[in-house]
């Protein structure tokens, strides 16, 4: 079977945003709880940049998988979600580690300011926080600003030329392709939909800044949203499915239970 990425129909970004928000609403409880937990861990480990990057990437990639699960299942359960994430954990962690290491090398070689020690990628007290502000809103901003900043950088990590593509991870996990094949296929889909992908990139840059400053408590929602947005874009480009699958009716769910089948 040969997969050929499609060019999305006009109005793709608006369609993807609406579909992503619908998936987010359907799976909000468990999904948001896991995202919030990851954001809090990013805050706890904010002195360790590599760890924070790994956590942020894992949270975003995990959200892509959860979005696929929400789309396919009438109801999302914590046990099922954790099982699914555990199955894909090796690929998720390897891909996150690859991006983190590549990003660290790029920072050391090209982006580090003069006089900044290279080992700051492992541990830094710069911009570290010891005491939270007594003001509740400011304290929330202090907590979630690190995960907001990390989320904004994730887009660039997912688009390292010759190494990663924004659709590569779902190609590996949801289509079962090996790394190189997923990279080539993901890059082809990205090129065919360059304007829409660049618009997604603009959202990756702008929304974390706005939410980090104005709505910090909703930063975990952004991880879920961008995971869902990436998934629905992937789904339309590579699978030709532009709309979310409808939820099963309550009657169908009841009919599928063991009790109803024994009656």
What does each of the following model-derived ranges do?
Residues 1-263:
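Hydrophobic alpha-helical membrane segments
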